[in-house]
């Protein structure tokens, strides 16, 4: 999409006669790589603006570099709280979990009759921790009881112990703020 847009803009004469040049780095969803990519793009490549990173964890680590350099950074799916409070050069186009989760919980309560839930979240990631914190507040506001709270770390593959505890707690549902790799395994093992 970016390349198509740049090609179209450049074919029409660019921006004020200047051609757009895209410089692409892959931060691989890792904080350290995001920091390295931002430093390279800002200080070596001298880019005027950054798009990304996609993950809140990477954004929280790398966006302060852009802010300090007064380089605009635009995150495309940074939903964790606190990202845009890094500074006035940090933007995002996605709503926060604090905005989404209360509506999601209210809908689940109304349509599914959920009265008590178990929570299984990744405790070593900004996105999943923020999701947990916001989910907890939304549950309290809807008066939904939490039967048990279990945690996992990014990269875990065996969730049997947590799922056994969740099952014995008698919840109506399970909330899993997490990424697809762990969430898919949790769903598979929960069956």
Regions found by a protein language model. Name each.
Residues 1-3, 25-32, 54-57, 120-129, ...:
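Extracytoplasmic "Venus flytrap"
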């Amino acid at each position: 999409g970016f390349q198509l847009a740049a090609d179209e803009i450049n074919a029409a004469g660019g921006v004020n006669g200047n051609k757009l040049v895209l410089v692409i780095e892959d931060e691989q969803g890792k904080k350290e790589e995001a920091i390295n990519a931002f430093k390279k793009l800002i200080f070596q490549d001298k880019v005027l603006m950054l798009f990304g990173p996609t993950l809140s964890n990477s954004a929280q680590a790398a966006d302060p570099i852009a802010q300090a350099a007064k380089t605009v950074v635009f995150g495309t799916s940074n939903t964790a709280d606190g990202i845009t409070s890094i500074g006035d050069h940090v933007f995002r186009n996605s709503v926060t979990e604090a905005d989404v989760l209360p509506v999601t919980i209210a809908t689940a309560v109304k349509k599914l009759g959920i009265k008590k839930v178990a929570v299984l979240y990744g405790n070593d990631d900004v996105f999943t921790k923020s999701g947990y914190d916001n989910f907890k507040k939304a549950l309290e506001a809807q008066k939904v009881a939490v039967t048990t709270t279990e945690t996992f770390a990014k990269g875990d593959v065996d969730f049997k112990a947590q799922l056994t505890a969740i099952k014995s707690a008698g919840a109506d549902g399970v909330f899993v703020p997490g990424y697809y790799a762990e969430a898919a395994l949790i769903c598979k093992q929960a069956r």
